Structure formats: C-alpha cells, structure tokens
Amino acid sequence: MATVDPIRYPIGTFQAPQQFEAGEVQEWIAAIRGLPSDLRTAVSGLNDEQLNTPYREGGWTVAQVVHHLADASMNAFLRTKWGVTEDGPTVKPFAESEWAKTADACLLPIEPSLLLLDGLHARWAALLESMTEADFHRTVRPEGAAGEMPLYVLTALYAWHGKHHTAQVASLRKRKGW
C-alpha cells in the first residue's frame, strides 16, 4: 500500500461512504457550513509573503488554495443543484490546475474569495439541509467517470475537500511557526 504524503494530505485521502447515514450527512453539512469560518481562522493574520508561500514544494500558494476552494465550491454547489433538479445530469469537471494559474487566482487578494465562500456555503448548507434522504440518493454523472455519484457521496467529498485544504494551510503555518 502506498504511503500518503502527510503534507499533501494532512487529514488523509478521501474515503467515499458506501451507504447513506443520516448522522454522517449532518456532519458533512456542518463541515460545509463551517468551511468559511474555518478557512478564515487558518489564514488569519497571514501577510502577503505568507499568502504567496506554497503549502508544499511544487504546490499551490496559500492564496491559490483559498481561490481554489471558492472555485471548487461554486462547482460543487452547482453539481448539487443539478443533481436535485435534473435526472442524473452529466457534470463537467473543471481544470483545477489551469484555474489556479488564472489572474484572479494568482493576483487577487483572498478577501473576495472568502466573501464568496461566506454566501455560497450559507446557501449550499441551506440547500443540503432541505434535502430528503431520497434527494441524497439522486445522482450526478461526472463527465468521463465510469458511473454515477449519489449526492450523499458528493456531499461527503466536499466536506472532506474543505477540511483537506484548510488543514494544508494550518499544517504550513505549524511547520513555519506562523
């Protein structure tokens, strides 16, 4: 079994749930709702030099991680909406590494992305809280993937995703003594 890089994956890799568990779903929703606050705490007090430091060698800068979380959350919110309102929609992936190179991800301060996350995650959590168990069993079909993804798995994935990237920033701060 391959060793997981603890700098790249400080909370481990994503483990997809095999079945729907209402209690777990509530934890995932809480994580999604809490991401903006958790991320703000992780980046609080960092100066421009620190924000422009890669969280690992060859990795994104802290600022790029923040902007990536905004990009990924927008995509995940839309995937959730499509999954709830359409029958098994195909959802397009986004080229994360290319998006991280765009001017808004490289040059813009992080505050616009933090503000976007505040509103978006409030809406996303409200949507998730309104969903029934049947809704969470609805699926999306990631373009190029072998099968369908139930919305409860998508929810788990993005709950993990936010914690994963927030932990990357927190880990960098700890390693650097910031």
Swiss-Prot record:
Homodimer. It comes from the Bacteria. Its EC number is 3.-.-.-. Keywords: Cytoplasm, Hydrolase, Metal-binding, Zinc. Its main location: cytoplasm. Binds 1 zinc ion per subunit. Pfam families: DinB_2 (PF12867). Belongs to the metal hydrolase YfiT family. It is found in: Cytoplasm. GO terms for cellular component: cytoplasm. Its cofactor is Zn(2+). This is Putative metal-dependent hydrolase GK0616. SUPFAM superfamilies: DinB/YfiT-like putative metalloenzymes. Possible metal-dependent hydrolase. One of its GO terms (molecular function) is zinc ion binding. Zn(2+) binds at residues 68, 161, 165.
